[in-house]
A protein has these predicted regions:
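P-loop NTPase motor core of the ASCE superfamily
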Residues: 3, 104, 108, 266-269, ...
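A short acidic, often aromatic-flanked loop/helix-cap motif at beta-alpha or helix-coil junctions
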Residues: 1, 70-75, 311-313
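P-loop NTPase motor domains
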Residues: 6-11, 16-277, 281, 290-292, ...
């Protein structure tokens, strides 16, 4: 069910992904795409709109677009919503540690981040409240009232709160420095700063929705990868509660950017298959994958190889028992030609058809989709400001709580 795609830039990977997604749209199969460069989003929107026109129907309720670069409106995706079990919180903590390079600050910083995320999740809060939690004693005390996990409460009440101000500052500053760089950017602040997500990934999978995450890393920077990592982790956690097991595909270019080291990608792929979720992972070179991730990717059942570098061609030809002739072919494949190998079959060569972007104006489709899933950013910021003002005003004399 899973598919690994490998090939140099311009050799046909995008044509293959377009072809597969166009088939999914035509046959009502759901998918999520992490569009790291923003190159697939226009094709998807155009293809959905072309189908609407051909069939005289409306499909905006099937389409969900997460677009941090949209300056006017934004969906909400709170990764901490409902994440009040320790395993899920630990996964989010691991993602943030790696994305923000917090590992070298040591175990104390790691423990503080993990327990802080758990406390925020238990209170129905967001990453935006992390600074308040770690700097505002009264706010932290009020949060502890809703934390059922005794170890988390004891960590803050018996350990963190008993430290000197200087020691607490030393522990929290690396976390807050990295967090603020993410949450201060309006492109991402208005997505993760909403207490309630605009949609459920589990329901989107069950309904066969088309979820497009337009990350535009070249324009939005490294924060786009953090958002993509959080969304992929949210999807992983949503797998286990699926009511339906109909096929849902995750298209992910450069997947190594979105999974944490030691997160057990091979386990994720195995579990996803059980719940009807297929991954299509595309990349340019094998050495872009960390060793553990590379092993998991190479164990996927179906591989499609476009033109490869000399080193990768040698490695793959040896794995396929093709020897030097196959290695030479892999190095010299014409554009859109690929070698396909599934687990039980001998490798074969195919030609991927050219898939052109439909020449349609999908502005109305985007407007309808935004109306259903998104909120005006000015309104989101107003809600955030009001919420944080309310929390800041909490004092030790009058802790009114919030519900």
């Amino acid at each position: 069910m899973h598919m690994a795609v490998l090939g140099k830039t311009g050799t046909g990977k995008s044509s293959l992904l377009r072809h597969l997604m166009a088939q999914d749209i035509a046959q009502d199969r759901g998918f999520l795409v992490l569009d790291i460069h923003g190159e697939l989003t226009p094709f998807i929107l155009g293809t959905v709109n072309a189908r609407e026109r051909a069939e005289h129907c409306h499909l905006s309720d099937r389409l969900i677009v997460v677009s941090p670069g949209d300056r006017e409106m934004s969906v909400g995706l709170n990764p901490l919503e409902g994440a009040d079990d320790f395993v899920r919180v630990a996964e989010f903590s691991q993602i943030l540690r790696e994305r923000w390079a917090l590992d070298h600050f040591g175990a104390r910083t790691d423990e503080l981040l993990r327990n802080s995320l758990f406390a925020l999740a238990a209170n129905g809060l967001t990453l935006l409240e992390l600074s308040l939690l770690l700097t505002h004693t009264e706010f932290r005390a009020e949060c502890m009232k809703k934390v059922a996990n005794a170890e988390v409460r004891q960590y803050f009440e018996l350990r963190f709160d008993t430290l000197s101000d200087a020691m607490r500052a030393t522990m929290r500053e690396p976390i807050l420095n990295k967090t603020s760089a993410f949450t201060a950017d309006p492109a991402f602040r208005h997505i993760v700063g909403q207490t309630h997500s605009s949609f459920s990934l589990r329901e989107a999978m069950d309904a066969g929705a088309w979820v497009v995450v337009n990350l535009e890393k070249g324009r939005l920077g490294e924060n786009a990868l953090t958002l993509g990592s959080l969304i992929l982790t949210m999807l992983k956690n949503a797998l286990f509660s699926r009511a339906k097991r109909t096929l849902f595909t995750v298209y992910c270019d450069e997947i190594q950017n979105f999974v944490a080291q030691g997160s057990g990608i091979e386990t994720m792929l195995s579990e996803a298959r059980k719940f009807g979720v297929a991954f299509v992972a595309a990349n340019q070179f094998l050495d872009q994958y960390p060793a553990e991730t590379r092993a998991a990717i190479l164990s996927i059942g179906t591989h499609i190889f476009f033109q490869l570098s000399s080193a990768d061609a040698t490695t793959i030809s040896q794995a396929l028992d093709g020897g030097k002739p196959l290695a030479e072919r892999l190095k010299n494949l014409p554009a859109r030609h690929a070698i396909v190998k599934s687990s039980s079959d001998r490798w074969t060569e195919i030609v991927v058809p050219t898939v052109l972007e439909p020449k349609v104006d999908y502005t109305d489709l985007v407007s309808r989709t935004r109306y259903v899933q998104s909120r005006v950013r000015v309104h989101i910021e107003r809600d955030i400001a009001a919420r944080q003002k309310r929390y800041t005003e909490i004092s030790s004399e009058a802790l009114d709580g919030w519900d």
